[in-house]
């Protein structure tokens, strides 16, 4: 099947290549913000673990006393103009987007802005307030906005064949685009088979600094009551999973390290907007599975919280990332653009 898609991938790659070439030659205009801009992005269409890395960076910058704003796109959301995310909005996830709301909830000292165009949203943010730094969420391909640092995340669990250009693979542009990156991050390294990790490393440009991050679920929190269960308390328990993320297989793999995952678990398409009917189907499937716990991701919890408002059966995972090797190196790299 993939071979039949190759001609379409070739055409797509040519179009993207022309666009990038025009940006490289300065034909297209670029907005340069009055403060440093750091992009955290990827080559593929999603599921690299970008949001946890962004959250990791925000927490380290806030701890260092920096005033930071996040620039994101209102993907599959209702916001039609640049605006500041309001976590108290009655339908926050639907209006602003699940990932922006998740980042805003986890980092109350950070301003998170969304809009249909990242460069316009960045302009809106710096016109409203003074910041030390802008973090552009998923900004690698958005070249209309100048950035001072390009961080690209590569999923260590991703098959190398998926780095073929869309629609044959999952890449938004060819592997050659990685040369625009200043720093590469290999995510989920602890979840990747050693041979696959080595194959990915062998393909990386030799002139790029590479950082390694591991991902682990340490606990679950009840969405309604706030009760926390450590991973050790879930050992031997049957877990029914529900998610709408790009890589549900990775979510399942992490949960299998904790408990027994039900084979009746439900996974929707990435960024799916849940409905009341979805919740009824989830509840019915959960009951039929006879699982002990109904577990979802943090990103999904921001959308499901209100829909499960009358019951305390839903639990949200807490994903932690750990920097391997030289601790604090990513923070050091980012703060260098402030000097």
UniProtKB/Swiss-Prot annotation:
Substrates-to-products reaction catalysed: a lipid A disaccharide + ATP = a lipid IVA + ADP + H(+)
Binding site for ATP: 44-51
GO molecular function, one term: ATP binding
InterPro entries on file: LpxK, P-loop_NTPase
Documented EC number(s): 2.7.1.130
Superkingdom of the source species: Bacteria
GO biological process: lipid A biosynthetic process; lipopolysaccharide core region biosynthetic process
Pathway terms, separated by semicolons: Glycolipid biosynthesis; lipid IV(A) biosynthesis; lipid IV(A) from (3R)-3-hydroxytetradecanoyl-[acyl-carrier-protein] and UDP-N-acetyl-alpha-D-glucosamine: step 6/6
Keywords: ATP-binding, Kinase, Lipid A biosynthesis, Lipid biosynthesis, Lipid metabolism, Nucleotide-binding, Transferase
Xref: Pfam families: LpxK
A Gene Ontology term for the protein's cellular component: plasma membrane
Family of this protein: Belongs to the LpxK family.
HAMAP family per record: LpxK
Primary role: Transfers the gamma-phosphate of ATP to the 4'-position of a tetraacyldisaccharide 1-phosphate intermediate (termed DS-1-P) to form tetraacyldisaccharide 1,4'-bis-phosphate (lipid IVA).
Protein name: Tetraacyldisaccharide 4'-kinase
């Amino acid at each position: 099947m993939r071979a039949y898609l190759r001609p379409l991938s070739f055409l797509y790659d040519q179009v993207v290549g022309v666009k990038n070439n025009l940006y490289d030659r300065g034909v297209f205009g670029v907005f340069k913000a009055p403060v440093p801009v750091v992009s955290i992005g990827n080559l593929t269409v999603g599921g690299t673990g970008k949001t946890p890395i962004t959250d990791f960076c925000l927490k380290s910058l806030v701890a260092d006393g920096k005033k930071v704003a996040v620039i994101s796109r209102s993907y599959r959301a209702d916001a039609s103009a640049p605006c500041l995310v309001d976590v108290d909005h009655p339908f926050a996830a639907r209006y602003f987007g699940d990932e922006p709301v998740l980042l805003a909830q986890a980092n109350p000292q950070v301003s998170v802005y969304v809009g249909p165009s990242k460069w316009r949203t960045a302009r809106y943010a710096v016109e409203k307030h003074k910041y030390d730094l802008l973090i552009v969420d998923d900004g690698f391909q958005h070249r209309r906005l100048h950035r001072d640092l390009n961080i690209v995340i590569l999923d260590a669990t991703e098959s190398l064949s998926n780095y073929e250009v869309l629609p044959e693979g999952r890449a938004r542009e060819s592997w050659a685009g990685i040369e625009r990156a200043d720093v590469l991050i290999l995510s989920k390294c602890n979840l990747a088979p050693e041979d696959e990790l080595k194959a990915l490393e062998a393909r990386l440009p030799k002139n790029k600094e590479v950082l390694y991050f591991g991902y682990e679920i340490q606990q679950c929190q009840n969405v309604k009551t706030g009760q926390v269960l450590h991973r050790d308390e879930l050992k031997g328990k049957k877990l029914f999973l529900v998610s709408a993320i790009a890589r549900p297989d990775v979510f399942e793999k992490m949960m299998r390290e904790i408990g027994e995952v039900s084979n009746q678990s439900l996974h929707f398409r990435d960024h799916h907007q849940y409905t009341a009917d979805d919740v009824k189907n989830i509840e019915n499937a959960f009951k039929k599975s006879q699982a002990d716990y109904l577990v979802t991701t943090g990103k999904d919890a921001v959308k499901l919280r209100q829909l499960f408002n009358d019951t305390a059966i839903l639990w949200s995972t807490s994903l932690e990332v750990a920097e391997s090797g030289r601790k604090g190196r990513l923070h050091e790299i980012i703060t260098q653009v402030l000097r």
